Amino acid sequence: MSTSRPGAQQLIDTVVDPDSFVSWDQPLDLSGLDETYRATMAKASQRSGTDESILTGRASIRGHEVALIVGEFRFLGGSIGRAAAGRIVAAIRRATTEGLPLLAATASGGTRMQEGTPAFMTMVDISAAVVAHKAAGLPYLVYLRHPTTGGVFASWGSLGHITIAEPEALIGFLGPVVYETVNGIPFPSGVQVAENLVAKGIVDAVVPVEDLAEIASRSLTMLSATTERTADPADHPAWPITPFVSRPEPSEDEIATLWSAIETTRREDRPGVRELLRHAADDVIPLNGTGFGELDKGVMLALASFGGRSCVLVGQDRRYQVSESMGPAALREARRGMRMATELGLPLVTVIDTPGADLSPNAEEGALAGEIARCIADMTSLSVPSVSVLLGEGTGGGALALLPARRVIAAGNAWLSPLPPEGASAILFKDTDHAPLLAARQRVGAQQMLEDGLVDVIVPEDPAAHEDPEGFAAAVGATVTAEIEALLTPVD
């Protein structure tokens, strides 16, 4: 990061009215962290001058009261762990309660690798809080700073009413360093740049930091009719932060078992969404495309019936993703399914099974990150029952986009990770040999996710799905039916 670019506190001092900023941040509880992680946090704090990668609070900008969420890239690359996410959610909810407009100034590489899947899933919590804030009629302004990539750009960084960016800021789904580490080749230059995203209609404008106060003030003046204060801030303390707790080092058996499961989900003969429908659905009516002239076979959309219950099904098709990665159009087709379910009052069933979304320049310029964010936003605000099925591979934002349902089912060998384990290993250890260990540390497996409260039900694989595709599909279908029935049953 260029030394000429302001850090979090410097940006706050530049943008807000003098002496108006009041921090909402509570002291962090680091007692649950292991010694190594605690030392890493201490070094990051000393380097950045902040206690976390996020600062939040209340201030005025040219007389307009506003809530602030500001990222600090010098703190572990601005990465978002559970404490940082809890701080963000607390600030958003407090802003909503107090009727304040919200300005988020991002600077982040995405999910914190030290915390893995439990941290990755907090992008859903943050997005849901943003959706609720916007549903209350309150403005949400986003200022994308250098750099903003990964899960931050693919969630709350892409949900603003107005989205502006710092000049020449690096902004993209997968940062170029991570891309080259994972793929072995550099990402084409000139794509993940603020000015290019403006040219492609993804960002509204490029605004220097020194002009941010003016554009924010003008925007808030126009939107002032929607931002009247509804409560006294003293009556609403900040939302409590959920601390991250380090787990014991995984045993050799745990590492081997999880890695065997991951390899099993990558088998060519593993059944996918088509086998699920063939063996478990009563009837299926396939649908096609976005309805706006786009088609991506990486996602299939259908009306389906399980156990006599009709639903809209959106499923990632592992067969088609072998030759072509899932792009933005696939997620727009998924959102068509979400709209259809809402309009028809039908349950929505999503099936997650992907080695990862398309990482090409075309996908970046087609608003892949924004489509992931909008899928998450739509999933968290559905008015109809929803069930998601983590069927096999669950790599990155493309998987997270369809996961946040009311009930989450996982196959016994399924997994979810912010990056392929080999990619995360390459980033942290400069090799892929540590992938099995890192996958276990990041708690990517179905059983770990169940223990962490991220999955509701596991469908056992005994035998593995590829050894009995019909039986596996029937078991998943029966679980889907049971979960739909439970959601449709009135609670006394």
Regions found by a protein language model. Give the residues of each.
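Intrinsically disordered, low-complexity segments enriched in small/flexible residues
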Residues: 1-61, 65, 213-311, 315-323, ...
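General structural feature for long, well-ordered alpha-helical segments within catalytic domains
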Residues: 8-11, 84-91, 122, 193, ...
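Generic structural "secondary-structure junction" signal
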Residues: 14, 18, 23-26, 30, ...
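Charged, low-complexity, helix/coiled-coil-prone segments
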Residues: 21-42, 62-77, 97-104, 134-144, ...
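Cleft-lining beta-strand/loop regions that shape enzyme active-site pockets
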Residues: 57-134, 141, 302-380, 386-387, ...
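Conserved catalytic cores of soluble enzyme domains
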Residues: 109-229, 352-490
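Short hydrophobic "helix-edge" motifs at membrane interfaces and signal-peptide entry regions
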Residues: 150, 247-248, 343-344
